[in-house]
Design a protein with these regions (language model features):
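Generic recognition of short, well-ordered alpha-helical segments
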Residues: 34-38, 63, 91-95, 175
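Hydrophobic/aromatic beta-strand patches that form the interior of the parallel beta-sheet core
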Residues: 22-24, 52, 79, 120-122, ...
Length: 231
């Protein structure tokens, strides 16, 4: 297999509406990937999953907001899959959030396009689980880095499903990587029949007051105000 091509194989611009799972895979350099590239290949083999390899789709960082919104609107589960970089998401994934989750569409007045959908994080880290501990070099439990993801979901009315995380991606054994990929594919393929889902509450309502917006008159047009940003 030509590993350099693995990440960008398939549709660079997937169509909306042919599945109810929309998976965004964001890896800045698939040639360097050990785990995410295998997760990506596994995701492509699961029926009903639309996969978007973000760095292949938008090498110029010019994200097609309306197309992304169409794919999101068609989905029931949105999956963000990426390596953790500087305790957060890769830059293009962050730009996608900035550009696509627009006021009046994803949140705020009339912003109900994502309400009732689920968000699932599939993350990898270089650091071992023990490093994410008050006595480790990352100083915090890994969960302490997740509230920005979780609150982004909740602000959009989405349920935040328990993330799937692989720590110590560089040092994990081959068998551990294979087992992880298998767990991931099994869960992706069996959504929404996950035991814990029935026990999750709907996202609590979060209203953004007009005073937190740059210009309240501009905003409530219900149209995707791509690139307006949050405040
Ligand atoms: C720019 C950059 C920043 C990174 N930041 C972190 C970090 O904050 N925490 C961590 O545990 N690993 C960090 N890593 C390591 C990656 O998370 C790790 O290489 C990746 O999860 C391995 O997955 P892959 O085999 O699919 O590339 C970073 C890597 C890069 C290149």
């Amino acid at each position: 297999m030509d590993e350099t091509k693995e990440g960008s194989r398939g549709n660079a611009h997937p169509r909306a509406g042919d599945s109810d799972v929309y998976l965004l895979a964001a890896h800045p350099d698939w040639r360097e990937s050990r785990v995410n590239k295998r997760l990506l290949a596994a995701a492509r083999g699961v029926p009903g999953v639309t996969v978007n390899d973000l760095y292949a789709a938008y090498p110029d960082y010019a994200i097609d907001g309306p197309a992304e919104q169409e794919r999101l609107a068609a989905a029931r589960l949105v999956v963000l899959m990426h390596p953790i970089q500087w305790y957060s998401m890769p830059a293009l994934q962050k730009l996608w959030v900035d550009d696509v989750l627009a006021y009046g569409w994803a949140y705020g007045p009339g912003g109900t396009a994502l309400k009732g959908k689920d968000l699932w994080l599939v993350l990898t880290t270089g650091g071992q689980e023990e490093a994410y501990h008050p006595s480790g070099y990352n100083r915090y439990f890994f969960d302490a880095f997740l509230p920005p993801y979780e609150q982004t979901a909740v602000l959009c009315g989405m349920r935040f499903l328990p993330p799937l995380v692989m720590h110590g991606s560089h040092s994990a054994s081959e068998q551990e990587v294979l087992d992880h990929v298998q767990t991931f594919a099994q869960r992706l393929g069996s959504y929404p029949d996950w035991p814990e889902i029935a026990e999750l509450d709907a996202a609590p309502a979060c209203e953004v007051p007009p005073s937190d917006r740059p210009d309240a008159d501009d905003d409530a047009d219900g149209v995707a105000d791509v690139r307006h940003g949050m405040a």
